[in-house]
Amino acid sequence: MASVQEKLITCVCQDKPAKPTNKITIVGVGQVGMACAVSVLLKELADELALVDILEDKLKGEMMDLQHGSLFLKTPTIVADKDYSVTANSRIVVVTGGVRQQEGESRLNLVQRNVNIFKFIIPQIVKYSPDCIILVVSNPVDILTYVTWKLSGLPQHRIIGSGTNLDSARFRHLIAEKLGVHPTSCHGFILGEHGDSSVAVWSGVNVAGVSLQSLKPDIGTDEDCCKWKEVHKQVVDSAYEVIKLKGYTNWAIGFSVAEIVESITKNLGRVHPVSTMVKGMYGIETEVFLSLPCVLNGNGLTSVINQKLKDNEVGQLQKSAETLWSIQKDLKDL
């Protein structure tokens, strides 16, 4: 007896279903992972979304919750499993998994614990999606992007850290707020480490091509009576403030990740401040990943913009590299 489906539908092609062309995987379904997932779905970037985590009940619950909203989305397939086979044929894998810093724990110890987790995650990703681009979001993101590069064996252009893409967005928002314009009309970069040693590139900040430094030569320095330097401090402190208020950050990093994913999936060639290997640039001679303005397209991170930095900015960038290397050089089992 024919089923309802067989009575309803006449099949004209017996071929297997086509493989997804823009499958996105999110590793980790915590607050950040789910913000990334929702942002990717709302921007309609994936024809399949896969979620992976070790917490089976939460994983299944998040998958079902998203599937129940399928009517309002344009991603036809949403799947989840703790087994990484569910990630097969991913175009981009976003890694948000890892452990948080415990009270009194050293940064090196935190990184080493995350290295041990990545030693399981990364080979599984590469096994099932050998041609994928990996976007690392877990913190400390620059060091874990280096760890991912080492563990994956993939070329540098396919290993990207979310880096200071969000820091730069915060920077532009705060400057725009002071000037009374929209953040998209205010241009500027935070480079270097995603963290306390990040570098505010005041020499490049502009609105409609008008350099703020040309209007106020001491902008962003200790001599600046208007205290624009506080804007960078606010950028550095903002995550801590949000965490203090709500317990975690998730929405802004989710939006930031979706913007990066969009540049890749749509082959846009947009410039993002993301974490990449910087050895040989700006006098840095160690294998560290730092954020520089990078061109992202369908092949991944294809080039770096050679920004004309001032001497003090280059010095800060080098110091940022030294900060990361001081942690990185003592990592084991890579």
Swiss-Prot record:
What InterPro entries does the annotation carry? L-lactate/malate_DH, L-lactate_DH, L-lactate_DH_AS, Lactate/malate_DH_C, Lactate/malate_DH_N, Lactate_DH/Glyco_Ohase_4_C, NAD(P)-bd_dom_sf
Annotated transmembrane regions: none
Subcellular location, record wording:
Cytoplasm
Q: Predominant location of this chain?
A: cytoplasm
Enzyme category, top tier:
oxidoreductase
- Which residues does UniProt mark as catalytic? 194 (proton acceptor)
The lineage's top-level taxon is Eukaryota
**What are its GO biological-process terms?**
lactate metabolic process; pyruvate metabolic process
Q: In which pathway does it act?
A: Fermentation; pyruvate fermentation to lactate; (S)-lactate from pyruvate: step 1/1
- The UniProt annotation places substrate binding at 107, 139, 170, 249
Detail which positions bind NAD(+): 30-58, 100, 139
Keyword list (alphabetical) reads: Cytoplasm, NAD, Oxidoreductase
Q: Which CDD domains match?
A: LDH_1
In which family does this protein belong, per the annotation? Answer: Belongs to the LDH/MDH superfamily. LDH family.
What role does this protein play? Interconverts simultaneously and stereospecifically pyruvate and lactate with concomitant interconversion of NADH and NAD(+).
- Name listed for the protein in its UniProt record: L-lactate dehydrogenase A chain
Organism expressing this protein natively = Xenopus laevis (African clawed frog)
Q: Which gene encodes it?
A: ldha
